[in-house]
Regions:
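Hydrophobic ligand-binding cavity/cleft-lining segments
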Residues: 1-39
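Aromatic-glycine hotspot motif
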Residues: 1-13, 17, 95-106, 139-140
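Residue-level preference for beta-strand/loop junctions
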Residues: 4-5, 44, 58, 86
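A short gly/proline-enriched turn/hairpin at secondary-structure junctions
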Residues: 7, 31-38, 50-56, 78-80
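Generic structural detector for well-ordered beta-strands
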Residues: 8-14, 41, 49, 65, ...
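Hydrophobic pocket/interface hotspot
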Residues: 20, 30, 48-50, 66, ...
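Hydrophobic-ligand binding "helix-grip"
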Residues: 39, 56-102, 108-112
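A conserved amphipathic terminal alpha-helix motif
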Residues: 102, 109-147
Length: 147
């Protein structure tokens, strides 16, 4: 199977790198803008799961495993769905730009997922989802004065 180009979403936040790193690695912070994670530890080998909703309200159990952690720089985890073939990888990379932080999210391997009737695993859906999550959810969270 030909591997598609990864999805890449980049945004610069008016927030220090420590705040952005905590937002993507602390489960209590993540619940405020990302998904409702029961547990999360930024440690290689740590497995976590959460439910996400499909286009028609279907619940998909996401199964993830932390692959790589470079504190305040990089976080990679696998991303797959319970009961479906395929595996993908999500990477968050952080770059300090003065008192701002540039985040680069890449998601690769999503083409290994099956085609569903509602195209829940289509590249366009992932792009739309990540654009909202990174461009709106995370931005609003880290740029708030007190959270």
């Amino acid at each position: 199977m030909k591997e598609d180009q990864p999805i890449i979403v980049e945004r610069t936040y008016n927030a220090p790198i420590e705040k952005v790193w905590n937002a993507i690695t602390d489960k209590d912070e993540m619940k405020k803008w990302y998904f409702d994670l029961a547990e999360f530890k930024p440690e290689p080998g740590f497995e976590f799961q959460f439910y996400g909703e499909g286009k028609q309200g279907e619940k998909f159990l996401h199964l993830c495993k932390v692959i790589e952690v470079i504190p305040k720089k990089k976080l990679t985890y696998s991303w797959r769905y319970d009961g479906y073939e395929g595996n993908s990888f999500v990477t968050f990379e952080l770059f300090s730009e003065g008192n701002k932080t540039r985040l680069k999210l890449s998601h690769k391997g999503f083409e290994s997922f099956p085609v569903t009737p509602n195209k829940d695993f289509a590249k366009e859906n992932f792009m739309e989802g990540w654009t909202y999550i990174i461009g709106t959810g995370l931005r609003e969270f880290v740029e708030k004065a007190n959270n």
